[in-house]
Amino acid sequence: MTVLSCSINTLIKEGLYEISGVEVGQHFYWQIGGFQVHAQVLITSWVVIAILLGSAVLAVRNPQTIPTDGQNFFEFVLEFIRDVSKTQIGEEYGPWVPFIGTLFLFIFVSNWSGALLPWKLIQLPQGELAAPTNDINTTVALALLTSVAYFYAGLSKKGLGYFSKYIQPTPILLPINILEDFTKPLSLSFRLFGNILADELVVVVLVSLVPLVVPIPVMFLGLFTSGIQALIFATLAAAYIGESMEGHH
């Protein structure tokens, strides 16, 4: 037992169990002041944001009474997001449409960019580019934004009375209700991250093992599941906001 204890202590001292150092793949960092910034995520996120803003500006810069193809597409997307928000939040959905829409569009375009844009062709000093949602930092940030949003929604409508939900229907459930607020962002972030990472890894492995034509059906399936993941994230975010405003589980 003494030998085993000493061995474990030695391993820990050598840093072999530093969980914070565990990474999926190699990463490229920028050192800005005293902060280490994950450059890959910033670069790809800026590209996705530029695609969204550029597409919106080009499509609706000159609105027509009879919509053009681009304007018609964006109006369809807006109606879809409004329907999702209204279904999950209720009649007070209006102020939350921009937030839900931003989540859905950013995640959707991020997911598709991983399959459609040739990120791998861009050489970096270290690591390689990939979809923003292929990185846990992005998905955790989106999940935390959702948590802040539903706390704000509940507090803005009910004030401090919002916290009474933690002891309903009985105070015995207080620990479980508190734990639920931690599991929501965890489930949102890891579900999205895991699905997108797994999809890209499957495609990479298939391309390396078999001719390029064979993985194409898997790539199309990946595009479909990427869209579904964006819809799931946005729908759950809207549902959590609606739940916090209504005060029921």
From Swiss-Prot:
Signal peptide: none annotated. It is found in: Plastid, Chloroplast thylakoid membrane. The chain crosses the membrane at residues 40-60, 97-117, 136-156, 201-221, 222-242. Its main location: plastid. CDD domains: ATP-synt_Fo_a_6. One of its GO terms (cellular component) is plasma membrane. Pfam families: ATP-synt_A. Belongs to the ATPase A chain family. F-type ATPases have 2 components, CF(1) - the catalytic core - and CF(0) - the membrane proton channel. CF(1) has five subunits: alpha(3), beta(3), gamma(1), delta(1), epsilon(1). CF(0) has four main subunits: a, b, b' and c. This is ATP synthase subunit a, chloroplastic. It comes from Lobularia maritima (Sweet alyssum). The gene is atpI.
